Amino acid sequence: MSKYSFIYTLLLAAAVLFSGCKQASDLRAFTEANYSLQEVHDLQLNGVDVMKKRGPNDFTTSEGDSLLASISNNTLRASTTLYLQVHMQEPEEVRQMTITEMKWQLLVDGEETLQGVVQEPMHLHDGLNELPIQTSVTMTETEGMRNYEGLSKLMTLLSQKRDLRQNLIFQIKPTVQTPVGEVELPKYITVSGPRSS
């Protein structure tokens, strides 16, 4: 092995080691960050724009049938754009994280109600992140029974057209890309609504 090959190999190994340490540091920083869901835009369930619906009479018969069948079969699909604010403990350091998959759950009055998985890559950074997502939506189950009561509470809250942040908790559990492969975070991260000023 020539002197230049040895130096090149040594520099390459140092770069890989530094990159791995940086990604581990970034992963820790994102785990310790504060998350705030700022906005949800263009929420569609099975292709139906539910943000424009004010009540049951606003749905066509086919839209209602499609949604009811999907809820009954636990095959509901959602697409939306989330605006997620990430506040790092050390904002002066530039960090980013690639999420390869993200489990999520929605709690209504502290009770797990809906859950799903986003299976497309997303990139997070400090600040406001615009995240267009498509996801499955299933009802949570306890002892084999679906949580229809939680879904009913959610529908009642939505129909009241008021601030839902006191009743809803959104949690995420991302799987992130690291130098040694994909790693799922060990627990859910609570994504609160915007902080009041």
Where are these regions (language model features)?
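Bacterial N-terminal signal peptides that target proteins for export
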Residues: M1-Y8
